[in-house]
Amino acid sequence: MFRTIANAWKTADLRKKMIFTLLIVLLYRIGANIPVPFVNITEALDTSGGNILTYFSMMTGSAFNYGTLFALGVTPYINSSIIIQLLGVAIPAIGRLEKEGEEGRKKIAAITRYLTIGLAVLQSVAYYFYIKNTNSDYLAPTEGTFAAVFEAIVIVICFTAGSALVMWLGEQINDRGIGNGISIILFAGIVSRIPTLIGSLWQYFTRGGVFYALSPIVLVCFLLMIAFIVWMDNAERRLPIQYAKRVVGRKMYGGQSTHMPIKVNMSGVLPIIFASSILSIPTTVQMFVNVEEGSFWEKFFNVFSSEHWPYAIIYFVLIIFFAYFYATIQYNPVEMANNLRKNNGAIPGIRPGKSTSDYIGKIINRVTLLGALLISVVALFPILFQLGTKAGGLDMQISMGGTSLIIVVGVALETVKQLESQMMMRHYKGFLD
């Protein structure tokens, strides 16, 4: 990976793109530290407990904890992209746009932008009320209804504008930089939390006792998880494909053997995001209602808190469910079998048509289960570790979870692959010139 980056840096055109991408990331990190008018959060907001605030904190690189200009980060854009992707299956009109080539993609991009702004407004309003309910001292004091309404409007506009600006920065990377813009910004936000992770591990290490032994173990486990995610991201099941020979005029076409790759982790981090979002709803509701100690509702809400064991079980089941749900959206065995037949291709030993589609469907189900189990292991490890240490009376908190690691490693690998393809393209171009 480092050799690829070093070789890309030697190419003038790629070097300009890499510098441009780094400058955009720098602008994003500056914006993530710019305060919003009327907001003065002196202490980081508590985003532990497995509620939706944990998700926002992870996605924004802790900018959410301090109410800065980019407090919402790329979250509205990611949520709107997921919604549009799901609507593409439910609404035929959107599904047709996805198949209309460049024009269709432009229309979908425009719809995604409008939906992003709408979600940003809603999330900004919710964030404002959360800050107000958490500690009224975090907002500038106001006198009268007009001043309070004006303050709320300014704060909501700033958070919404910050989210729109983050989306624009991501699109600039897409057009003039390297990698997927939104993914790069998300990567930068998560990586910015690494010093906090190292600092907390060092504090545990210096406390001595059992923490002296646990801290290096945690660090080694994280390194092993990174290696495991790299392997998982590149793992694929290859279905052999044989194309029949056909004669057109005096030329013979086909006859070659190839394969159809099916990625083990075909859904990426989406099942984890979906599962986290669903589980965050009850605990988010709990923040806005008064629950009596020892009541039924307190026990009910505790089930959905990451500080309790039932959360891990429900989380695991939801990840499996959403992995299958996403695989159903992404892969259509009948369509894949029809495309093979149209191109005179077949899987050796399998009859074309329904037998082929059934076979492909069976393979996809098996691969999906394996991939879902693997990402569940990565996502649940930090949660189970914290629950285990808490049960032992240690309560060792980890500031970076498995979701963050999957995103960081996935974005890094994808960016390196794009660099390699850009270098290959320029190599062939120079050869032809």
Whereabouts are the PLM-identified features?
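N-terminal cationic and glycine-rich segments that engage phosphates or anionic surfaces
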Residues: M1-E98, E103-D433
